[in-house]
Amino acid sequence: MVGIDLNTVEEEEDEEEGGATGTVTAPAEARAGGAVCLELWHACAGPVAPLPRKGSAVVYLPQGHLEHLGAAPGSGPGAAVPPHVFCRVVDVSLHADAATDEVYAQVSLVADNEEVERRMREGEDGAACDGEGEDAVKRPARIPHMFCKTLTASDTSTHGGFSVPRRAAEDCFPPLDYSLQRPFQELVAKDLHGTEWRFRHIYRGQPRRHLLTTGWSGFINKKKLVSGDAVLFLRGEDGELRLGVRRAAQLKNASPFPALHNQISNTSSLSEVAHAVAVKSIFHIYYNPRLSQSEFIIPYWKFMRSFSQPFSVGMRFKLRYESEDASERRRTGIIIGSREADPMWHGSKWKCLVVKWDDDVECRRPNGVSPWEIELSGSVSGSHLSTPHSKRLKSCFPQVNPDIVLPNGSVSSDFAESARFHKVLQGQELLGLKTRDGTVNTASQATEARNFQYTDERSCSINMSNNILGVPRLGVKTPSGNPGFSYHCSGFGESQRFQEVLQGQEVFRPYRGGTLSDACIRGSGFRQPDGNHAPGAAFKWLAPQGCDHHGITTSVLPQASSPSSVLMFPQTSSKMPGLEYIYGCLDRNENSRHFKIGPTQDMTRTDQTLRLWPHLISGKVLDECTRNEKLHSPVSGAEHESNNKCLNTNGCKIFGISLTEKAQAGDEVDCGNASYHSRLQSLKPQMPKSLGSSCATVHEQRPVVGRVVDISAVNTMI
């Protein structure tokens, strides 16, 4: 084991080293080569291994010392030792373990709280009083003639040698005589213990390269080096070659300290520290710079300066660290908060800053740092504190029209979406909702509105390609004269299995509850011919402003056995209510829109097959161009009695095409909207050929035009 007294380095820098070889054990022998050994020790310790100087003022943090020893949080003397102990450095000596070549330092300290308190009262700066500054505690300047290489599998094999980069060989090794056919030379290098190692340096191969051959395998076996460890060579000012190692296993796995360090550095030693602090006697701290990610012996000036900086959430910082290839690098991050790392050490500033690293994947450091470890590099706005992430699908509330008001003062919207559309892309989340007083509500009321849904999901909706939806049960009123409704044509034929939609392609399911759909969607409408209503009618269609039509009623909402199968109506004795659908036809020579109305004939469900256009099922109307529906307010009692006299069961027409053999011509209604001139002409339905009188096959992914729904087995309808 080698002991190097750091305090005598400056006095003996110019002394030449003796030619002794072998392992050096006496401190005097170590001091003889102090300057070179100091460089080698720092080279093996890594680029971030600061050490205090003799006589300097430091702050000792026992909490960090416990973490350095691997003790569990909450262990140690606790209240017996203050979280920050102001000390004076009595001595610093450097050591290297004989078995592993691992470097560590022994720092002797004495508590000096009174002197520090006096300085703080007088407002003196620690660096000025000690004659110290940043340069005084820095590690020695970068050694110009040094290289470090991580060993590969071929470097550690017994058959080959150690391949040296050409630039490194020319910088560190003595020059070769390239006039020879095979240039070579003998190299002698000393390790931390003063042991000499001899290697044959040759320049050969195709292409030619520098190799260490003879003697290299013996060095690998003796030091027990493996692939991943690092070997470094440096040449001092006197031209002598030095050799050191850095073990990757100790850096990655935090292997135990060397033997001397293990004998003294344990949890019980903190009890001795507590006693030494109380009586102001000297105590010793053993410090391994490669195993400690954070310093727990801090220069006084550095400790005090860290508290003069205004740390705040959102500030960016840089932190120096040693990479696996033994080079110095900087890691960056953002401050996101503050905390006490261990409640037992109340008031401790050890790792009190909570940070977020920019390289979360590669970073193995904890999310807490100490103020004196980092260098501030700027600040960011609060909107950048969140983690950047790629666009991904997320569950979403339906995006609603903010101008539709529910009876309870909340909001509603026009919906025509299948229940299977559950996801949208990021940025398509729920918008604000507008109430009667103009205020905007958000997700809470949208959730309330979504609760107005059918109990049986199967009977209410299928995929939007089929556009078959159940009838709502609770009236929702559309404000008259509202110009905020806009409808856009959309084609049919989307697959029922399409589970996701892109931005701008969302359609939404209806709220559960409400009366039948709006009979007029900006230019189309429905009309109920004169006749008697069925008794006990519970639903009717009301005309919105600008449309002239009557309502129709039914007594009980029929149920569908399955969205993709023939609709079955279990009632046995009721007759079909009078029903008319107004098919819109545009006159190309006029800015008007005409609708043909066809009354239905009396018929029972047991002897008629009802061929329905897919957009009109069980009293529900969907706009062909928009696939949207409008909802109405509940029917008042007076309107209910008045419209109960208008039921007629003569027949049914859809888009001007009779659904029965006894279809009759109807009236014409003008709703005045020519915006869908070409669209509605192209969408004029064509009835398919008869598929028989029993049932019709429904293909879910085919276009819905001309779909036949067989209800010949229907007994009744209320």
UniProtKB/Swiss-Prot annotation:
- Name the Gene3D superfamilies on file: 2.30.30.1040, DNA-binding pseudobarrel domain
Locate the region Disordered. 1-24
Give the quaternary structure.
Homo and heterodimers.
InterPro entries documented for this protein: ARF_dom, ARF_plant, B3_DNA-bd, DNA-bd_pseudobarrel_sf
Q: Which UniProt keywords apply?
A: Auxin signaling pathway, DNA-binding, Nucleus, Transcription, Transcription regulation
The record's DNA-binding region positions are 147-249
Q: Which SMART domains match?
A: B3
A molecular function annotated in GO for this UniProt entry is: DNA binding
Name the family the entry cites: Belongs to the ARF family.
Protein name in UniProt: Auxin response factor 2
Q: Where is the composition biased (Acidic residues)?
A: 8-18
